[in-house]
Amino acid sequence: MSGTPAVTFYRWKDLALEKVTDSLDRRLITAERMMLAQVYLKKGCIVPKHQHENEQLTYILEGALRFWIGDDGKQEIVVKAGEVLHIPSNIAHRAQALDDTLDVDVFSPPRWDWLNHTDTYFHRKEK
């Protein structure tokens, strides 16, 4: 049937592992209106404060992440294996891996800064 979008099948193990920093690697699957990311964070890894238009779901498969939410970072949430955090569009957040952590992030729309490698906030040093 012409006009019917084709389905696509993926295996994580077949996708390239991108080294973002010394303590963070990821694999990406991108569709027209969403993105799925498998993210590996070493214990102690810091994701500096940032915000984006993309709505985000973070599902922790292994380990745990501590999030600081909002411009002031006063809301603190620890997300452990089996738990999911929803971050609405344009909400500032930062995170720290409390253990070696594997998470799956869903973004809508896709994170074009991740795809075109303009996500420079990963390399900012935080105090």
Task: Tell what function each PLM region has.
Residues 20-22, 37-51:
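Conserved short histidine dyad/triad with adjacent acidic residue
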Residues 89-113:
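Ligand-binding loop in jelly-roll beta-barrel domains
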Residues 1-33, 37, 120-127:
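A short, N-terminal "cap"/entry segment at the start of jelly-roll beta-barrel domains
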Residues 73-89:
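Short acidic-glycine-tyrosine-enriched beta hairpin
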Residues 46-48, 66, 84-94:
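Histidine-centered metal-chelating micro-motifs
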